[in-house]
Amino acid sequence: MVQSLQTFSVRDIASGGWFKQHEYIEKLNMQAILNASAGQEEMIKDLLVTHGKIPTLIHELISVEIWKLKVFHVLCQLQDFQPKSTFPLYMVIHHEATIINLLETIFFHKEVCESAEDLTLDLIDYCYRKLTLLASQSSDRRTLSQNRLLPHTANEASSLEELKQQAEALEFDIALKCLSVTRYISDHIDSLPLSVMNRLLNTHNLPCLLVELLHQSPWTQSEKGQLQKYESGRWYPVPAEDQLKMTKLDGQAWIALYNLLLRPECQQKYNINSFTKGQLLKLRSFLTEVLLDQLPNLVDLQRFLSHLSVSEPTPPKKELILEQVPEVWDSIINENSGKWKAIAKYQVKQAFSPSEEDLRSQAKRWAQTYNMDVMEALVPEKPKCGSCGSEASKRCSRCQSEWYCKRECQVKHWQKHKKACDMVSEAMKNMQEEIQKEA
């Protein structure tokens, strides 16, 4: 399975071979998460490194990103495109999330970062694009991420407009995965080429972007006076006793900042001008005793900022460095420039207008790939109540997707949950009917 992974052109996205590889990557992603959460030997990571497939995954990640920007945009504007099912389209859109999720799981390891080779720069640029978009979005992001909808099956085609909303919802999750990947790259920056450090610090000024993300904290919000935090793909209400507890995403941002600002090799290369200095000093207001108790290493960052506030940073020495440059984005754009509409029309005919028989076959394969027992095992923590955020042991009998700690919470939450429950139940029913017909 791993040895067969390959790069596809934008034109061949959604082809039979491409969908087969998508299923492979989904299964690899699930197995990697299971191994990591269970503390088992991470065979998937080892196989991907041994067979040199990390660059392949990064190339495919950027390829689908470009497809969404260039081809999907055209598809949504085609007046005569009314697909029987948007499931194939959704699978392409979801492919990007699958790959970044797999990379997040395995990039914790130094050998994975090193095996990305020249495409580390491409991955850094990708993460920077996603994090910049996250920082620039308005407070409407919660609505997008919370109301992610399941695509309908062949019996009930959802609109392309709805699919666009699903794509936007996925962007939020993708950006949060990119935050973790950025942190892991910063962990191993001393074993990566100098061009990686320069791109993080001076080309993109990642520390300033991380400051902005900590300031905005897009993974927390308040609704009707109730603090909520985003975790494992959902918003959860936070009990009063946990409101000062650092989230995993806060921790990723702080650790990345610690690495980029305090490692000696980074301090020698980072060009801190007056603007950057002002941005970094904003961090001092966040470094409370409560935060330092949870992440004691940040005391060193506090000292660094205190020193920075009373000193003028020395510009780094100008050295002649032959740097690598990212190539994947420009290569794909240049190869397909002026062809986006033609590619979209080709894919409408060849990939996104399947016969009833093809849809049944796809539904059967997807049902096998997204096995519910396996999906539940991917969640390392116990489920939380959709109403109050406490640990939950009961779930909705209709859709099987929402959890509650007690019946009172389920009754209270029903009006909010009803629409999603109806859609999930209907989608599951339709898929089962398709599989039964095929059988």
Swiss-Prot record:
Keywords on record: Cell membrane, Cell projection, Cilium, Cytoplasm, Cytoskeleton, Membrane, Metal-binding, Zinc, Zinc-finger
Similarity section: Belongs to the ZMYND10 family.
Result of knocking out the encoding gene: Ciliopathy phenotypes. Although a large percentage of cells fail to generate cilia because of a substantial defect in ciliogenesis, the numbers of centrioles is apparently normal.
GO biological-process terms attached to the record: inner dynein arm assembly; motile cilium assembly; outer dynein arm assembly; positive regulation of motile cilium assembly
A Pfam cross-reference name: zf-MYND
Protein name in UniProt: Zinc finger MYND domain-containing protein 10
Record flagged with keyword Transcription: no
Species whose genome carries this gene: Xenopus laevis
Binding site for Zn(2+) 1: C385, C388, C405, C409
Keyword Membrane among record annotations: yes
Assembly and interaction partners: Interacts with LRRC6.
Gene Ontology terms for molecular function: zinc ion binding
N-terminal signal peptide: none
GO cellular component, as recorded: apical plasma membrane; centriolar satellite; cilium; cytoplasm; dynein axonemal particle
Zinc finger boundaries on the chain: MYND-type: 385-421
Function, in words: Plays a role in axonemal structure organization and motility. Involved in axonemal pre-assembly of inner and outer dynein arms (IDA and ODA, respectively) for proper axoneme building for cilia motility. May act by indirectly regulating transcription of dynein proteins.
Binding site for Zn(2+) 2: C396, C399, H417, C421
Subcellular location: Cytoplasm; Cytoplasm, Cytoskeleton, Cilium basal body; Cytoplasm, Cytoskeleton, Microtubule organizing center, Centrosome, Centriolar satellite; Apical cell membrane
Domain of life: Eukaryota
InterPro entries listed in its UniProt record: UCP037948_Znf-MYND, ZMYND10, Znf_MYND
Main location: cytoplasm
